[in-house]
Amino acid sequence: MIGVIFYNTKGNFLRVKCLDCGNQQVVFDRAASYVQCIICGKTLVEPTGGKSKIKAQILEVLD
C-alpha cells in the first residue's frame, strides 16, 4: 500500500475578483511572488515575507 502524506499549511487559497476587469481566479494568501490577473495583467497579490498583500476583492476562502 502506498502511503500519502498531507501537510497542513498555514496559508489558505482565496478566490479573488480583479477590480479592473472582473475576472475571478484562485490565489494563495502567502504567495512568494507577484500574482497578476490572467486577463488584464493587473497585480492581484504582492508578497510581503509572510501573508501577502491582496489588491483584489476576496470572494471566498477555499478549504
UniProtKB/Swiss-Prot annotation:
A single GO molecular function term of this UniProt record: structural constituent of ribosome
Gene Ontology terms describing biological process: translation
Required cofactor(s): Zn(2+)
One Pfam match: Ribosomal_S27e
Mapped zinc finger ranges (C4-type): 18-40
Co-factor note (free text): Binds 1 zinc ion per subunit.
Name this polypeptide is given: Small ribosomal subunit protein eS27
Lineage: Archaea, Methanobacteriati, Methanobacteriota, Methanomada group, Methanobacteria
Gene that this polypeptide is encoded by: rps27e
